[in-house]
């Protein structure tokens, strides 16, 4: 039952967040739910509507995390890595919502684009999940070098995934622009997405 599933997510996100580890786990849970929803939704529009709700419900985690001064002693990269997971989700929610109203894409193409965003979110969420043992130490023992190496690796992966999400967006918007240009309808594309030079 999809509606019940979303309700469960909302309840989870009402927890009182008392430590950074819970913030990170909340963000990971939110993105994982977005990925799961987009895999089970019947089409691109329903996918976007469901995942947008989940993203908005989880937004409080990102806002609270931005206010945390010391997530891990001496490692701003951990905080930046987690926040990039939110950035990637936002890139999908904001841009794909516009693509859904773009007549230059077919339904099949929109489904394929959604699948591409899904893959990027899934991989980036897995990377962040690896940081949990650093943020909330468990029985897993890591020396300083191992921790630093893990943080640097995950940070590098997240920078890559964020760039990939932006590149993927630009690539798809450029397809729309070229199709519109053939019909002399470029202005409609600019009106929909804006004239940000990074897209064109």
Q: What residue spans do the PLM features occupy?
A:
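Extended amphipathic alpha-helical interaction segments
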Residues: 88-168
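Alpha-helical heptad-repeat coiled-coil segments that mediate oligomerization/polymerization in large
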Residues: 30, 40, 106, 172, ...
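Long, charged all-alpha helical bundle/coiled-coil segments in cytosolic proteins
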Residues: 47-120
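Residues on one face of amphipathic alpha-helical coiled coils
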Residues: 36, 43, 50, 57, ...
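Perimembrane helix-loop junctions in membrane proteins
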Residues: 36, 64, 137-140, 174-181
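Start-of-domain marker
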Residues: 12-74
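A cross-kingdom marker for long, charged
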Residues: 174-200
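Single conserved hydrophobic/aromatic residue that forms the stacking wall/gate
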Residues: 1-10
